[in-house]
Amino acid sequence: MKIASVDIGTNAVKSKIFETTPTSIKFIDGIRSPIRLGAEVFEGGKISDKKLRELVSTLKRYQKKFTKDKIDQYEIIATSALRNTTNSEEARTYIENKIEHPIRIISGLEEAQLIGFHPKAQKENNKAYVDVGGGSTEIYIYNNPKHSIQSFQLGGVRLMLKKDKRKEWDRLDKWLKQFNDITEIIGLGGNIRAFLNAHKLKKMKSDDFLKKYKNLRNLEIEEKINKYGFANDRADVIDFGLKIYERIIKKLEIK
């Protein structure tokens, strides 16, 4: 059986396709389209008709691929940008009518809860799973038998547009204070993945991360593209996404 997921995010629309059996699931293919919904939402409060038409066109393209690849089932979810736009329900209804498929707008806490479905998330103590998106950051921590989840209105695009708020940083700091035995951060999301791939690494020590992040921050956007091969919509936002990881690393005193 083939299944697919579609994530309407703040910085891009992404899809992953999997082959499943009763006992296994295997990743087959992925698609990414750089539609930055968050720019309109965080600047003007709502998604424009033009951007909605662009989104619909992208989703229809995905649907054609699903038909061609004989996908048996797929789900479309939307996160920070669609839940924060002032025309959220109107936008969802418009998209659903155009693509003839339901869209589920999930809360930040639901996003954080979904991290718990990671195969290792409920087996590894003292590790923080951190998903930094374009509009929000979700954290999942498992300390047997306690599960802790939280969502914060801090994300790469939000920071880039200077729409983050001091009280949200304070809320993050206060929440992290309760954890004094976290030994490792598992980073999820496009920014940390691109950063590690750029250095041909799967993991790194916190000191090394902070040093390499500082070096990256000092580069111009074109330099990041030329040196690391980042896409335009990754090169301009990656510093801001990594800034959130930097804050969490320091607050949790990760070595």
Residues of each region from the PLM?
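Short, glycine/acidic-enriched loop or turn micro-motifs at the edges of active sites
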Residues: 10, 134
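Helical "lid/coupling" subdomains associated with nucleotide-phosphate turnover
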Residues: 17, 40-71, 79-126, 141-255
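Beta-strand initiation motifs
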Residues: 23-28, 146-148
